[in-house]
Amino acid sequence: MVLRAKCIYCGMNSPGTFDHYLPKEDYPEFAVLSMNLIPCCEKCNSKKGKRWKTDADSRIFLNLYYDLIPNVQFLFVTLAYHDQSHVPTVDFYLQLADSIDANLSSMITSHYEQLNLLNRFEDHANK
């Protein structure tokens, strides 16, 4: 049973599985290391797959056990009313401050893009 209330990658869904942040096929010595087992939802786990770094050795996904998230806002939302229904539409977007380290900024952007989080947040907000 996964003990966290929400997926550590998206923060929306209940975790139903564990992701091996470092793939167990490539790093069998870390296969059961608790810090390598990330409680996550099936959607994030399937989107992430076995990937964790680019061909240039840059990490693709945040690991909230190790990465220090900047203490500045980088996720924003715009609410708009476009018709007489009075139902707002939402538009989530990233705006990374120059004060955020370039490598971390790149990883944050990649994390949100690879997991399709901005679109998933919009879908979730419009339910």
Descriptions of predicted regions:
Residues 84-127:
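Long, charge-rich alpha-helical interaction segments
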Residues 14-97:
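Glycine- and acidic-residue-rich phosphate-binding/metal-coordinating active-site segment common to enzymes
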Residues 6-8, 16:
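Active-site-adjacent scaffolding segments
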